From Swiss-Prot:
GO terms for biological process: NAD biosynthetic process. It comes from the Bacteria. It catalyses: deamido-NAD(+) + NH4(+) + ATP = AMP + diphosphate + NAD(+) + H(+). Homodimer. This is NH(3)-dependent NAD(+) synthetase. Pathway: Cofactor biosynthesis; NAD(+) biosynthesis; NAD(+) from deamido-NAD(+) (ammonia route): step 1/1. ATP binds at residues 36-43, 138, 167, 189. GO terms for molecular function: ATP binding; glutaminase activity; metal ion binding; NAD+ synthase (glutamine-hydrolyzing) activity; NAD+ synthase activity. Catalyzes the ATP-dependent amidation of deamido-NAD to form NAD. Uses ammonia as a nitrogen source. Its EC number is 6.3.1.5.
Length: 277
């Protein structure tokens, strides 16, 4: 099995995701969105889809750099802003983040990264409240399955059009959407500290893990069959452990059931049935 097996009909994917954005916004009673523009491929793809679905006047991009953020990230975010002609604001997070960092040791990179991600989430939701825009997420399927993201940080949003696309599929969609090539070919990075890269953090490439996840989820192959495809056992075991261990990140908070009608369990009226007022 090869990574090419993950290829999709990206014309169809585009149509489905544009309809998703348009219809979900209507159901929620919104007409515009706000999203973080990091300069990476995921936010670029979501921004492009939002403009095609809603019109550029209904899309606001926030650039939220920290002092150590790379200039390349800002340049690539601005490249998308100019390409699409959307509204954009730059809101540096350095003053807020540094107030937290004063009590977090420099070698605690995970804690510091989480603080940065959650600070950006606060800004996105504040702009949502200010302007009446729906916060749109940019986490891809690979990140969500592996738990490679910050709970109530970059994983927080009201809707997410690319959450069922593996990273390699996001790249394929990006080429279909004519996203600028520099954003597609650069090494993926959350840009949480200088020199940080996703694949260095994870210890494997997106191509390798996407193929493994595809076999585990979409093909529903067991361990024996997957190892028969040339996947090394330690790699399989590590990825499976990450998927299982991070299930809590893919769920709403679990509620202890005490009554006959519990929110999120058996009190679940579909919002589609309700008239938006």
């Amino acid at each position: 099995m090869k990574v090419q097996d993950l290829h999709l009909d990206y014309h169809l994917v585009e149509d489905i995701l544009k309809a998703f954005l348009f219809n979900e916004l209507r159901k929620f009673g919104f007409s515009s969105v706000v999203l973080g523009l990091s300069g990476g491929i995921d936010s670029a793809v979501v921004c492009e889809l939002a403009v095609r679905a809603l019109g550029r006047q209904n899309v606001l991009g926030l650039m939220m750099p920290y002092a150590s953020s790379s200039m390349e990230s800002l340049e690539h975010a601005e490249l998308m802003i100019k390409k699409l002609g959307i509204q954009a604001e730059e809101m540096p997070i350095t003053p807020v983040v540094d107030a937290f960092f004063s009590s977090v040791p420099e070698n605690q990179l995970l804690r510091r990264g989480n603080i940065m991600a959650r600070t950006r989430m606060i800004l996105l939701y504040d702009v949502s409240a200010r302007d009446g825009r729906l916060v749109t997420g940019t986490s891809n399927k690979t990140e969500l399955l592996l738990g490679y993201g910050t709970l109530f940080g970059d994983m927080a949003s009201a809707i997410n059009p690319i959450g069922d696309l593996y990273k390699t599929q996001v790249r394929g969609l990006a080429r279909h959407l004519a996203i600028p090539e520099p954003l597609i070919v650069k090494a993926p990075s959350a840009d949480l500290w200088e020199g940080q890269s996703d694949e260095d953090d994870l210890g494997f490439s997106y191509e390798a893990v996407d193929l493994l996840l595809y076999m585990m989820l979409e093909k529903r192959m067991d361990k024996h069959a997957i190892l028969g495809q040339g996947i090394e056992e330690p790699f399989y075991d590590r990825v499976r452990k990450m998927v299982v261990r991070n299930q809590y990140k893919r769920m709403m908070p679990v509620i202890a059931k005490l009554s006959g009608r519990t929110p999120g369990i058996d009190f679940r009226y579909a919002r589609d049935w309700q008239e938006v007022r």
